[in-house]
Amino acid sequence: MSNFHNEHVMQFYRNNLKTKGVFGRQ
């Protein structure tokens, strides 16, 4: 359970970074 939660958070964090990068370039 803890491992699955960790993976989910990392995926969400990576998506967040990607979105922030796109918005930052605009």
Curated annotation (Swiss-Prot):
A Pfam family reported for this protein in Swiss-Prot or TrEMBL: Nuclease_act
GO MF annotation terms: nuclease activity
Q: What is known of its domains?
A: The conserved N-proximal 18 residue region of Stp is critical both for its anti-DNA restriction and ACNase activating functions.
Q: What is this protein called?
A: T4 Suppressor of prr
GO process terms (BP): regulation of viral process; symbiont-mediated evasion of host restriction-modification system; symbiont-mediated suppression of host innate immune response
Q: Which gene encodes it?
A: stp
* Domain of life from the UniProt record: Viruses
Organism equals Enterobacteria phage T4 (Bacteriophage T4)
Protein function:
Plays a role in the inactivation of several host DNA restriction systems including EcoprrI or EcoR124I. As a consequence, it activates the host anticodon nuclease PrrC. However, the phage-encoded RNA repair enzymes normally offset the damage.
Q: What is the lineage of its organism?
A: Viruses, Duplodnaviria, Heunggongvirae, Uroviricota, Caudoviricetes
- Keyword line: Host-virus interaction, Inhibition of host innate immune response by virus, Restriction-modification system evasion by virus, Viral immunoevasion
Q: Which InterPro entries match?
A: Stp
